[in-house]
Amino acid sequence: RGGGISPVVIENMNCKSLPEAPLWDGKMRGILDKYKENNTPQLIIILGQEAWASYISQEYKPDIPVLCGMISKNAILLPDSDLNVAEWEPKYIDIQEYVDKGLHLGGFLYSYDVKENIRLIHNLYPKTQNIALITDNTYGGLAMQTLVKKEMENIKDLNLILLDGRKNNIYTIVEQIKNLPDQTVILIGTWRVDVNDGYYVGNATYTMMTANPRIPTFTLASVGIGHWAIGGFSPKYRPIGSDLAKE
């Protein structure tokens, strides 16, 4: 539609839940190794958190411009193959670091504003003492958890409770929600995959909501808006295919 004539080759990494993460580095390396010398592309387009993490985790990155989409400004590098991801405490990485190092990068990033969400919570519920963060057993869930933990290091008098899908299924999460202490606010990150690699759709948040409907709930990523979450500062998600093509 944009008048381009260059051929496009599509590769799919088939990434699913977080326990597979140690394998993604090798998958990406295998894809990159297919396109060398006379087969070298003019541009690499990376879509999705898992593919992006696999690319930046490469020891050697080809000197080819990269466009990215459907990824977060915050990231974490992939773990070693012998690591138990349920106990993994990754380091927060800002994508700007790679731009500063000379990576030819463009595209569209999602930015999650933890501080603004905490400020909103405090404005509406000034007696809040605990933030219960819900994240799932995916790369995106853990990257979001890592970001929240980093941002809350500088926030005094506020305790972070992790409702972590790496260690729980929806039933154990529901029990934890039932037993949350007073003066707690729930902050929803994401919930698609649980500890058993069970996949969930929107009805999961309805189940969580009924566990303790008296607890105020906010959202980082628009999950729960319209039925559970009061509100929150979230990225503006939208189709980006045509915009990437124009880039």
What kind of feature is each model-predicted range?
Residues 1-247:
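Short hydrophobic alpha-helices and adjacent helix-cap/hinge residues
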